[in-house]
Amino acid sequence: MDLAYMAELPQEEFTERRQKVFAQMQPNSALLLFSEIEKRRNNDCDFPFRQDSYFWYLTGFNEPNAALLLIKTEDAEKTVVFLRPRDPLLETWNGRRLGVERAPQKLNVDEAYSIDYFKTEFPKLTEKLTALYHASDRHPWGDKLIAESAVKFYAVFDWQPMLSEMRLIKSPNEIRLMQQAGQITAFGHIKAMQVTRPNRFEYEIESEILHEFNRHGARFPSYNSIIAGGDNACILHYTENDQPLKDGDLVLIDAGCEFAMYAGDITRTFPVNGKFTQPQREIYELVLKAQKRAIELLLPGNSIKLANDEVIRIKTQGLVDLGILKGDVDKLIEEKAYRQFYMHGLGHWLGLDVHDVGRYDDDRSRTLEVGMIITVEPGIYISEEADVPAQY
């Protein structure tokens, strides 16, 4: 894959998304989104800034302390941004700002104001409107600005369901970026396989993965990396990554890069010393069989539930064949006996967030559509304390 093919979305795509939002808003209403703000790590040091995914989805703007306001009347639509003004002193210390003057052209919006004037301009812009789309409690700093502006609306709607459904269906450009995120993530996993050996620490492998991400233009992981040797792999969200890898153990790696704001997510398990034991191979091949079958079934018109039900049957039958479970397969499935070894779902939506937004419906029975992106990660977890044949 040519990793230089695309590094960001064209501004026209953000404009098109806003037009789709306007089409779903009722007349005489406004939709308001706030950006993320900088967050303190410890005294005088902030965490690296990461934009709110919804705000990014409609703006492509990567600065804190900003707001997007969409205004729809009976006969017109207007897009307004509030953002930090230029400040030469603060920009010398903390980095460049787009500024109010350049924002309309750069972001393709109608008007721009300093965020410092939100409390005075927001009432003027919305004084004749009756409804507001706003996700309260998502950003307390924004809720405070709204309260201080003293604007009252006849109706308030949560925009999250609407925007979540939009985000669920990826455009061709988004898919290309996510393919790149997936490829870079795969490079990291391949590097990990190449450098893993007994007595190396989990964090050493993590550092190799992160370095590979960085080499290909992905500065940050999309979530905290899991490098879990031996029994640590039975802790689903293990992130200590501070133990030595032991000869004869397996190591589970769950890691993904974030590229152009989009998440990669890959989980792989392999032997620390490079060679499976026979029992390890049997479990590995059972999981692989289930994964391949799930991928065959995850097609438009089917559902995650359909694929997961098949995965459960394959695993349960396989565990019976290996003597790990005992009894009738149908009865074991009905009793959920597999849950002690497979305690999570088959996968999740993937996009701007690693656990991306969008409805699943009951039991993940939602019909799959073109443009949805889902992870496929069945697993079998057998802890040291599990009551199973000794070889496992």
Per-segment meaning from a language model:
Residues M1-Y392:
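Active-site neighborhoods and metal-handling regions in enzymes and metal-associated proteins
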